[in-house]
């Protein structure tokens, strides 16, 4: 079940269509997926090709998907961080806009590392939005 503004949707396609229509209605130039935690369909991506960005809690291409923080700890990584990238059909695979790194401490657990990464995300997301806007407005993404 998908919900949007108190409205229930049984199918993902109907849910995405509602969102797409709303974004088109408001002539949205950039879609920012921060905390979205859902994989969008090719239908959605193609409606806003090169105009969707996502923030992800790892230094991509390492640790794609929903368990990036847990995986970085379990694999004994010493450094992690966050990445902002353009959204493509393959999960966490689009062109990188910006990354920031931090050390994983010996006493870090999923909760403590998540909080530290989130603080880093809050620092780079505004700059990434500005950079993405520049790339879109100058049509740079066609050759990116």
Where in the sequence are the language-model features?
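One-carbon transfer enzymes
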Residues: 3-144
């Amino acid at each position: 079940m998908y919900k949007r503004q108190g409205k229930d949707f049984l199918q993902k396609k109907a849910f995405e269509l509602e969102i797409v229509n709303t974004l088109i209605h408001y002539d949205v130039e950039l879609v920012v997926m921060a905390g979205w935690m859902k994989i969008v369909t090719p239908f959605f991506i193609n409606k806003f090709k090169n105009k969707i960005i996502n923030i992800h809690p790892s230094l991509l291409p390492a640790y794609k998907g929903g368990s990036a923080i847990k995986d970085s700890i379990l694999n004994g990584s010493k450094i992690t961080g966050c990445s902002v990238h353009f959204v493509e059909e393959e999960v966490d695979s689009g062109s990188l806009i910006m990354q920031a790194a931090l050390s994983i401490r010996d006493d870090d657990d999923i909760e403590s590392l998540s909080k530290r990464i989130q603080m880093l995300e809050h620092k780079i997301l505004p700059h990434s939005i500005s950079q993405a806007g520049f790339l879109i407005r100058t049509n740079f993404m066609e050759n990116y």
